[in-house]
């Protein structure tokens, strides 16, 4: 039973049934309502009204209110705001009507209004300032002035102005000035945020805020990437993240192109691992390492060992950045010569780029239509950047006519941060070198330069171009003299040092000059191209804002990926370069040779340690006090046989002091494998077992590899330790170990027959071996040898054996034998025929009608892939066929280039199989390769030199050479197949078609040249010997047909043979008499002209020849069609109509023969005639003294 409430509750103090509303103070209720609206709660209309209130009062709304504003739907918001607009219009009409009634009353009311306005002006005087600009009134305001109407008293009455700009801040350097136009009654403002009702004025305000930086453009400058540096460098490049991706791509290509090696690497990796995880890891590591040793794999160690012959008095060194040479010679102390530092000082500033700018003092002058062109007076100031334009004007922005009005905006540009480029002068490069003697050194003093200098065991010196020679005193060890040839290895004209912020980089000159940033020169303060860091925003009726771009430092750092980082303060430390020195050792002497042997016991103070260079350092403690005495130390293979093996790096080690427990460091080089280090004599003898990993053959292989790298890297200063006058009895030994390439290291020197027989023997032994591990090892090694014996494999880079007249690129070989026969085992292939077909199609659409091959190997490549290309074109519905014609004469150049594309054509298996058996039909349009020039496909519409070597692969009978499309346009020949060398008195420039040989006999002169074909590219300077200050008119083989710009390409009495028989086949240039002819030197001889064959059209021999000032024996060309003489040698009294002349002119169209004085049949080698005869003498002095020039230009290590 329930009881109804009510009865008992009547007498309570508070009746729960009749409780009314709580009593709240009215102001508290209002506060609650307003606070809920500020928090974004409440009816939409109230929220919008509150936001409008904040907008009109220039107050900042709360975040919650803004959040509610953003959440309101568009249709709802538009409905309420439209009603607000109607209400505002009603209020405006009411005010206008009220104003007219008040004016009729007159009297004191007008005076009262004027006083009120004056009071407002006085109240605003502390914030607003008045001045003049462009002949009109200028008011300077701040952000507190825009909340109310600004009243300015004028002679015409009060001028009321309204400013509704949203970018008004506090005053600072970032100001903006523009016109507030006068609007007549009843016109609404249009495209203006400031207007007045009486007369136009200018407004100025600052745009700075307390909470954030100035407004800046979102745009950024596009800076082209720098790319990888071409310098051989010891340090990592900046942000070099692209190499990992490129290396993975190269690994993939290597696996595809060398499946045999990849299979063997996978088998070896699988055999090495004991579980599946290890097998996968080992296989991946082997596949990643393998291509590093098949392409671009040659590395440089930072320490070389040089052993001199007995009685040697001097030795040639090549010091590289951060490298160290250890020199050992009989009866001489061992020396360490170390390149400590390469430094360039007094850098000249070239150009400064601004990468962070600021924009201040913006002013805009506007004019109405038909009132003339706007002109901003600040245009006269060079520190301002101005821009003129046109805007829409009319009644809503102060103009009586509608139309385009002129506007002129100026802004002051100033640079906040700049990047400075500096150039290095070769004469300001200095080299700091240290020499250290392997003497008696304790572990405390090892590496302590000051202590070693105090003991006369070390010295430092600086080499500069002005002071290349120095003599160092080494105390009891005598003295050494160094004569150096400073060559930085850095082309200072091609690189700049660029400083960005706190970092400095070595950048390419062309990249630096092409930067799209404002720049200035050292002699000027004006910035050029300032518009690149400024943005003129869209112009309004009378206002145009200008903003600066943000700092471009991040973009510059990103673009500099691949550049070399250097340290720069007042000088720059270089990490690329080398120094060639001759070290004279005749005054060096061993110390302690007369000391007796130590008789007390030695102990190992520390366990012997591996230096990482194949040597071991032993720290010995001597208990005796009978010093000074020599240390009996030796390395032996067995304790039962004390025959010394290995050698001491520290020659004649001794204990220098008589104090007990003195410590001495000794360095020695043990043999590969197991050995014992024995110290002491008799029962006081101690020993330590040592194992040195590696092999003698592997060491020799790595040494040869290192020499080949120096040949490629140093160019005309390539050198060879085995070619310096018999000073060395062994080549320079790089002691860093070579991982990978083990098979070629052990068996690469054998013939393929020996490799095959040995492989078969090992396979047989593996099959018959009982032990599983031995059997697998024999089978794997035998299989590798059989594979090597049946495949030609290669590394990139070419080496020359001058004695055998042999050039080797990888393991493929290119031989120039004694009977002048060229034998090549190379085969050019495109990267993929599918992509090449698409490239051909794209080029044909762009107006390229064909190509000119650079060499005969490229021509053969086009012949080999022609049918496959045509099938691809046909399968993809392209009405185009590739036609390969036989080349005529030399391989000519053409102006256009093929361009790369990522697209490829597709072809099915059926079409591919059909292409092997049948050639496709000829299409209506053709793409012509080589052949004679025709009207349908002239040379000016052909492409040339569009491909370069990407990689070397393998093949059964030939080395495969893979080509890719060049990324840049160049006339240079491909350097991947070029080798240059100087050895003894012979210098050679060679590639797969040229063998140009020069000899030293009193002077260097061209001796002979053999041409497989004649091409039209230019020989690269990076592979040119002695190319300083060479005049092209003296080059016998013209520069335009790949003649090296070298002083080796000269001979006394002869000038450039631009009209030689270069269109002939099988050309051999040498200096001798053509069979059955004689040449005499006489002043009455004819003038220089095109080369003439010694037989006429009918085969009659011309026996008598002459020249004016040539040297004998004469220059001749031997070709398949007969013997020709050089341009200086002319026939004596012969019918001109029967002569066979060369029709070639190897100069390009803009050049003329500098020795020509008449028509082609009467061309003189003497421009001034007989009275001004030119004898053709050439200065052959190399500046290093007679026959030693060969050493100055480097040597070849094959």
Swiss-Prot record:
GO MF annotation list: protein dimerization activity; structural molecule activity
Disulfide cross-links: 297-324, 354-410, 354-415, 368-399, 386-410, 386-415, 484-581, 598-629, 798-809, 849-937, 973-1017, 1074-1123, 1085-1106, 1107-1110
Propeptide: 106-127
Alphabetic keyword roster: Capsid protein, Clathrin-mediated endocytosis of virus by host, Cleavage on pair of basic residues, Disulfide bond, Fusion of virus membrane with host endosomal membrane, Fusion of virus membrane with host membrane, Glycoprotein, Host endoplasmic reticulum, Host membrane, Host-virus interaction, Membrane, Secreted, Transmembrane, Transmembrane helix, Viral attachment to host cell, Viral envelope protein, Viral penetration into host cytoplasm, Virion, Virus endocytosis by host, Virus entry into host cell
BP GO annotations: clathrin-dependent endocytosis of virus by host cell; fusion of virus membrane with host endosome membrane; viral translational frameshifting; virion attachment to host cell
A cellular component term, taken from the record's GO annotations: virion membrane
Glycosylated residues, chain numbering: 142, 448, 924, 1001
Region described as Fusion peptide: 392-405
Domain of life: Viruses
Region described as Interaction with host EXOC1: 2-15
Site feature (Cleavage) residues: 105-106, 127-128, 219-220, 294-295, 794-795
Post-translational modification note: Genome polyprotein: Specific enzymatic cleavages in vivo yield mature proteins. Cleavages in the lumen of endoplasmic reticulum are performed by host signal peptidase, whereas cleavages in the cytoplasmic side are performed by serine protease NS3. Signal cleavage at the 2K-4B site requires a prior NS3 protease-mediated cleavage at the 4A-2K site.
Pfam families: Flavi_capsid, Flavi_E_stem, Flavi_glycop_C, Flavi_glycoprot, Flavi_M, Flavi_NS1, Flavi_propep
Annotated region (Disordered), positions in chain: 1152-1177
Residues annotated as transmembrane: 110-130, 254-274, 280-294, 747-767, 774-794
Region of interest (Hydrophobic), residue spans: 37-72
Domain notes: The transmembrane domains of the small envelope protein M and envelope protein E contain an endoplasmic reticulum retention signal.
Protein name, as recorded: Structural polyprotein
The species this protein was found in: Japanese encephalitis virus (strain SA(v)) (JEV)
């Amino acid at each position: 039973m329930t009881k109804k409430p009510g009865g008992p509750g009547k007498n309570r103090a508070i009746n729960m049934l009749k409780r009314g509303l709580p009593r709240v103070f009215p102001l508290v209720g209002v506060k609650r309502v307003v606070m809920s609206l500020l928090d974004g709660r409440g009816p939409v209309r109230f929220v919008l009204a509150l936001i409008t209130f904040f907008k009109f009062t220039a107050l900042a709304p709360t975040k919650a209110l803004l959040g509610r504003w953003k959440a309101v739907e568009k249709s709802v918001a538009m409905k309420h705001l439209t009603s607000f607009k109607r209400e505002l219009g009603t209020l405006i009409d009411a005010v206008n009507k009220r104003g007219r009634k008040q004016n009729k009353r007159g009297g004191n009311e007008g005076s009262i209004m004027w006083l009120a306005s004056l009071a407002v002006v006085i109240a605003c005087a502390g914030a607003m300032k008045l001045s003049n600009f462009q002949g009109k009134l200028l008011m300077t305001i701040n952000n507190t002035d825009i909340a109310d109407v600004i009243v300015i008293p004028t002679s015409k009455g009060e001028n009321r102005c309204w400013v509704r700009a949203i970018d008004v801040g506090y005053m600072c350097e970032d100001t903006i000035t523009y016109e507030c136009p006068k609007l007549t009654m009843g016109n609404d403002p249009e495209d203006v945020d400031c207007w007045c009702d009486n007369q136009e004025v200018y407004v100025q305000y600052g745009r700075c805020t307390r909470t954030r930086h100035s407004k800046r453009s979102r745009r950024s400058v596009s800076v082209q990437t720098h790319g990888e540096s071409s310098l051989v460098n010891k340090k990592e490049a900046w942000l070099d993240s692209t190499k990992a991706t490129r290396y993975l791509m190269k690994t993939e290509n290597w696996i595809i192109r060398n499946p045999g090696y990849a299979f063997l690497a996978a088998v070896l990796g699988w055999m090495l691992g004991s579980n599946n995880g290890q097998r996968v890891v080992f296989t991946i590591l082997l596949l990643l390492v393998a291509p590093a040793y098949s392409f671009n794999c040659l590395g440089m160690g930072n320490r070389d060992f040089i052993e001199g012959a007995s009685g040697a008095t001097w030795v040639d060194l090549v010091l590289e950045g951060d490298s160290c040479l250890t020199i050992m010679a009989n009866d001489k102390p061992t020396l360490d010569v170390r390149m400590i530092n390469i430094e360039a000082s007094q850098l000249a500033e070239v150009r400064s780029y601004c990468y962070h700018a600021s924009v201040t003092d913006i002013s805009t002058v506007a004019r109405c239509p038909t009132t003339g062109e706007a002109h901003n007076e600040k245009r006269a100031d060079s520190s301002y950047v101005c821009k003129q334009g046109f805007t829409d004007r009319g009644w809503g922005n102060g103009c009586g006519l509608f139309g385009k009005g002129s506007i002129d905006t100026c802004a002051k540009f100033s640079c906040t941060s700049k990047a400075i480029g500096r150039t290095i002068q070769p004469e300001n490069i200095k080299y700091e070198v240290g020499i250290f003697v392997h003497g008696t050194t304790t572990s405390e003093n090892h590496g302590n330069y000051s202590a070693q200098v105090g003991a006369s065991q070390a010295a430092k010196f600086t080499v500069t171009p002005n002071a290349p020679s120095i003599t160092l005193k080494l105390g009891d060890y005598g003295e050494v003299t160094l004569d150096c040839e400073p060559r930085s290895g850095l082309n200072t004209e091609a690189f700049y040092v660029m400083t960005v912020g706190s970092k400095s980089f070595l950048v390419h000159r062309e990249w630096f000059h092409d930067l799209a940033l404002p720049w200035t020169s050292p002699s000027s303060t004006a910035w050029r191209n300032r518009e690149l860091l400024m943005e003129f925003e869209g112009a309004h009726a009378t206002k145009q804002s200008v903003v600066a771009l943000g700092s471009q430092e991040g973009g510059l750092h990103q673009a500099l990926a691949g550049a070399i980082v250097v340290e720069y303060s007042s000088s720059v430390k270089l990490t690329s370069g080398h120094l060639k020195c001759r070290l004279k050792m005749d005054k060096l002497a061993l110390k302690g040779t007369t000391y007796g042997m130590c008789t007390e016991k030695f102990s190992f103070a520390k366990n012997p340690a591996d230096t990482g260079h194949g040597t071991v350092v032993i720290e010995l403690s001597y208990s005796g006090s009978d010093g000074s005495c020599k240390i009996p130390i030796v390395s032996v293979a067995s304790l039962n046989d004390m025959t010394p093996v290995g050698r001491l790096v520290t020659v004649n080690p001794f204990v220098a002091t008589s104090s007990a427990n003195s410590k001495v460091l000794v360095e020695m080089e043990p043999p590969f494998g197991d050995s014992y280090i024995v110290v002491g004599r008799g029962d006081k003898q101690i020993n330590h077992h040592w194992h040195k990993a590696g092999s003698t053959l592997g060491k020799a292989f790595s040494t040869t590899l290192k020499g080949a790298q120096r040949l490629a890297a140093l160019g005309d200063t390539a050198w060879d330790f085995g070619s310096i006058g018999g000073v060395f009895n062994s080549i320079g030994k790089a002691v860093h170990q070579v991982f990978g390439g083990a098979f070629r290291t052990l068996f690469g020197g054998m013939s393929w027959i020996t490799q095959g027989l040995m492989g078969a023997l090992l396979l047989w032994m593996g099959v018959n071996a009982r032990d599983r591990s031995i059997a697998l090892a024999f089978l794997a090694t035998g299989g590798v040898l059989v594979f090597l014996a049946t495949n030609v494999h290669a590394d990139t880079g070419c080496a020359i054996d001058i004695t055998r007249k042999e050039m080797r690129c990888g393991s493929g070989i290119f031989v120039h034998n004694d009977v002048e026969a060229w034998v090549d085992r190379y085969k050019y292939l495109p990267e993929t025929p599918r992509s090449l077909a698409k490239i051909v199609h794209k080029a044909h659409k762009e107006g390229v009608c064909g190509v000119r091959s650079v060499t005969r190997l490229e021509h053969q490549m086009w012949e080999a892939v022609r049918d496959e290309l045509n099938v691809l074109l046909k399968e993809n519905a392209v009405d185009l066929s590739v036609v390969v014609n036989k080349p005529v004469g030399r391989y000519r150049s053409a102006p256009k280039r093929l361009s790369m594309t990522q697209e490829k054509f597709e072809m099915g298996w059926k079409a591919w199989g059909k292409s092997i058996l049948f050639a496709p039909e000829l299409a209506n349009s053709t793409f012509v390769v080589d052949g004679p020039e025709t009207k349908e496909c002239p040379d000016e519409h052909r492409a040339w030199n569009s491909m370069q070597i990407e990689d070397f692969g393998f093949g059964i009978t030939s080395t495969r050479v893979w080509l890719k499309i060049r990324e840049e346009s160049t006339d240079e020949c491909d350097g991947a197949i070029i080798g240059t060398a100087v050895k003894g008195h012979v210098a050679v420039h060679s590639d797969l078609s040229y063998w140009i040989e020069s000899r030293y006999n009193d002077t260097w002169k061209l001796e002979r040249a053999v041409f497989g074909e004649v091409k039209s590219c230019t020989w690269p300077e990076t592979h040119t010997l002695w190319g300083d200050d060479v005049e092209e008119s003296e080059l016998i083989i013209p520069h335009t047909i790949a003649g090296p710009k070298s002083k080796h390409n000269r001979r006394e009495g002869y000038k450039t043979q631009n009209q030689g028989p270069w269109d002939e086949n099988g050309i051999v240039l040498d200096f001798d008499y053509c069979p059955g002819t004689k040449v005499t030197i006489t002043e009455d001889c004819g003038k220089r002209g095109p080369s003439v064959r010694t037989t006429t059209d009918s085969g009659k021999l011309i026996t008598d020849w002459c020249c004016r000032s040539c040297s004998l024996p004469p220059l001749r060309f031997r070709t398949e069609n007969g013997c020709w003489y050089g341009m200086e040698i002319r026939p004596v009294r012969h019918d001109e109509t029967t002569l066979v002349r060369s029709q070639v002119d190897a100069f390009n169209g803009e050049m003329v023969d500098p020795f020509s004085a008449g028509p082609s049949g009467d061309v003189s080698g003497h421009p001034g005639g007989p009275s001004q005869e030119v004898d053709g003498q050439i200065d052959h002095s190399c500046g290093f003294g007679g026959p030693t020039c060969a050493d100055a230009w480097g040597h070849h290590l094959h």
